Curated annotation (Swiss-Prot):
InterPro entries: Trp_synth_b_CS, Trp_synth_beta, Trp_synth_beta/beta-like, TrpB-like_PALP, TrpB-like_PALP_sf. One of its GO terms (cellular component) is cytoplasm. The modification N6-(pyridoxal phosphate)lysine is found at K100. Tetramer of two alpha and two beta chains. It comes from Streptomyces avermitilis (strain ATCC 31267 / DSM 46492 / JCM 5070 / NBRC 14893 / NCIMB 12804 / NRRL 8165 / MA-4680). It catalyses: (1S,2R)-1-C-(indol-3-yl)glycerol 3-phosphate + L-serine = D-glyceraldehyde 3-phosphate + L-tryptophan + H2O. Its EC number is 4.2.1.20. This is Tryptophan synthase beta chain. The keyword Metal-binding does not apply. PROSITE patterns: TRP_SYNTHASE_BETA. One of its GO terms (molecular function) is tryptophan synthase activity. Belongs to the TrpB family. Keywords: Amino-acid biosynthesis, Aromatic amino acid biosynthesis, Lyase, Pyridoxal phosphate, Tryptophan biosynthesis.
Length: 428
């Protein structure tokens, strides 16, 4: 199969036929879901071998999504990163505003191939929910989105977008009322309605085949970026950097660079209020191997093996697990993972906005914060590629409250402007 954008199963790279990435992955699900998950695996294998599937997906990615996404050098931002050159892979410019549409269109096509008429999905920041609702509108599929009640409040704009697109949005009020609980409810729905429903899983976690399938639909990010940075900079980057929650945007960027051992693959996890506070979602930094949502990976858990509640200012990173391929990359030493606090991410968000006129999603801002530190380590000869996984429209209320940007917070806003002036002065 020849395809410019859909390039599954790179030769010689994991997973195994059983869905394992080293010791991680697999399929740990209730009996009621075995047939449905196996059907997804079988149909996906057929789709990978079907040139028409690749042709249709390529057409959607070009003419509907707007691929290839741009590669933007951010020179003023880079002045604060030790003078290293910094390039952004602009997934924020995709239709719906993030990388999520890549995977959603692929799975929507698969849903149609399976003859299913209804799609369910989980969402944290709302970007996967918006992308899913968009694809369902395009394909004429019924759509139900599960979203933690806390996330519906801090991402109210995306809730409105989903409903405008025709989706039913169900606020999950159990547990921590965030992404983990939305996934739990979506799995319950799938068990009850498996005959006509496909669970359009939004990240590279879950039972096999979802980690590999979602990765394959996102590989286009790294394939494009690798070609683009060679054209723009004349060489491969020293580091490819992405935020990590479940891990889909990061693995999409990383995968094309795995054979390039001179390229460091660096994921930036949410450290929340700080690792020492316990209020974070830094799974690879502070977690232990365990089973969550159908696969074995690193999980945030207590001494008795119970899942602990994650925290992040970013709704899209607020997850106590991680995709099994990231666990494999960590343990093999091929991937590096750092924890970034809320404060560091928000400062990076503001810095990119003020120096480049690009407002990133809070999720992506974690990667930007990481890039600032990595650039200082690499120095002026360094070259950094950052995946800007989404735009920040959805986060404006959070950012405005954090920085005091509303008129009622004028004194706080003045302090924020003063801080930026001081930062810019330090860089000169």
């Amino acid at each position: 199969m020849s395809s410019e954008f859909f390039i599954p199963d790179p030769e010689g790279q994991v997973p195994t036929a059983e869905g394992y990435f080293g010791a991680f992955g697999g399929k740990f699900i209730p009996e009621a879901l075995v047939a449905a998950v196996d059907e997804v695996a079988v149909e996906y294998d057929k789709a990978k071998a079907d040139p028409e599937f690749a042709r249709e997906l390529d057409d959607l990615l070009v003419h509907y999504t707007g691929r290839p996404s741009a590669l933007t050098e951010v020179s003023r931002f880079a002045e604060h990163a030790g003078g290293a050159r910094v390039f952004l892979k602009r997934e924020d410019l995709n239709h719906t505003g993030s990388h999520k549409i890549n995977n959603v269109l692929g799975q929507a096509l698969l849903t149609r191939r399976m003859g299913k008429t209804r799609v369910i999905a989980e969402t944290g920041a709302g970007q996967h929910g918006v992308a899913t609702a968009t694809a369902c509108a395009l394909f004429g599929l019924d759509c139900t989105i599960y979203m933690g009640e806390i996330d519906t409040q801090r991402q109210a704009l995306n809730v409105a977008r989903m409903r405008m697109l025709g989706a039913e949005v169900i606020a999950v009020k159990s547990g921590s009322r965030t992404l983990k609980d939305a996934i739990n409810e979506a799995f319950r729905d799938w068990v009850a309605n498996v005959d006509r429903t496909h669970y359009l899983f939004g990240t590279v976690a879950g039972p096999h085949p979802f980690p590999a399938m979602v990765r394959d639909f996102h590989r286009v990010i790294g394939v494009e970026a690798r070609r683009q940075i060679l054209e723009r900079a004349g060489r491969l980057p020293d580091a490819a950097v992405a935020c990590v929650g479940g891990g889909s945007n990061a693995i999409g960027l990383f995968h094309a660079f795995i054979p390039d051992t001179g390229v460091r693959l660096i994921g930036c996890e949410p450290a929340g209020h700080g690792l020492e506070t316990g209020e974070h979602a830094a799974t690879l930094t502070a977690g232990e191997p365990g089973i969550l949502h159908g696969s074995r990976s690193y999980v945030l858990q207590d001494d008795e093996g119970q899942i602990t509640e994650p925290y992040s200012i970013s709704a899209g990173l607020d997850y106590p697990g991680i995709g099994p391929e990231h666990a494999y990359l960590k343990d093999s030493g091929r991937g590096e993972y750092r924890a970034v606090t809320d404060d560091a991410a928000m400062q990076a968000l503001r810095l990119l906005s003020r120096t480049e006129g690009i407002i990133p999603a809070i999720e992506s801002a974690h990667a930007l914060a990481g890039a600032l530190e990595i650039g200082k380590e690499l120095g002026k000869d360094g070259l950094i590629l950052v995946n800007l996984s989404g735009r920040g429209d959805k986060d404006m209320d959070t950012a405005a409250r954090y920085f005091g940007l509303y008129d009622t917070d004028a004194s706080v806003a003045a302090d924020a402007d003063s801080d930026i002036a001081e930062i810019e002065g330090d860089a000169k």
